[in-house]
Design a protein with these regions (language model features):
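A surface-exposed partner-binding patch
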Residues: 1-107, 141-144
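Short, highly charge-biased, low-complexity peptide segments
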Residues: 64, 121-124
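Compact, glycine/acidic-enriched structural inserts
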Residues: 126-144
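Short helix/loop capping segments that flank catalytic or ligand/cofactor-binding pockets
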Residues: 107-109, 127
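Short, solvent-exposed loop/turn segments at secondary-structure junctions
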Residues: 103-106, 115, 123
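Short acidic-glycine loop/turn motifs at beta-strand connectors
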Residues: 111-113
Length: 144
């Protein structure tokens, strides 16, 4: 769960930078995309996108109606692109979904426990970046 202290920080951040916030996701959109992808999103991701939509808060986090600065790709499109990439590399990895990318074609992924990874498409290696969205926001917005 995203801690209340972190959530308050995010609320203030998006008040200061409203152009970085998307349109909040609905429960129907979330369920529909989970069904399409065959994945259950982590509660932290759901909490974030229900409040802020696809938004940029230290990392661009894609949902359905993203801030124009995040781009138009949805979590569904990013995840399906990641799944195709894995098929090319013959590395089945289910239960991961793409919430972002690093700008070089490497998807940023979240697992069902809320851990955040980067998948290096050139080497087919994965590295954990953050234990949770909460730790991502603390590090990127507070520098902790």
């Amino acid at each position: 769960m995203i801690r209340q202290e972190t959530m308050n920080l995010l609320i203030k951040y998006f008040q200061d930078y409203p152009e970085l916030k998307g349109i909040p996701a609905s429960s129907e959109e979330i369920k529909h995309s989970e069904n399409i992808l065959g994945i259950k999103f982590h509660d932290d991701y759901i909490e974030f996108i229900k409040k802020f939509g696809g938004a940029s808060a230290g990392l661009d986090i894609h949902a359905f109606h993203n801030s124009t600065l995040v781009g138009e790709e949805t979590v569904i499109e990013l995840t399906q692109g990641f799944q195709k990439l894995l098929e090319l590399h013959e590395q089945p990895m289910n239960k991961l979904y793409a919430i972002s990318d690093d700008g070089s074609g490497n998807p940023i992924l979240m697992d069902q426990q809320g851990h955040i990874f980067i998948y290096y498409h050139d080497s087919s290696e994965m590295e954990m970046l953050y234990e949770s969205l909460d730790s991502l926001f603390k590090e990127t917005l507070l520098g902790e």
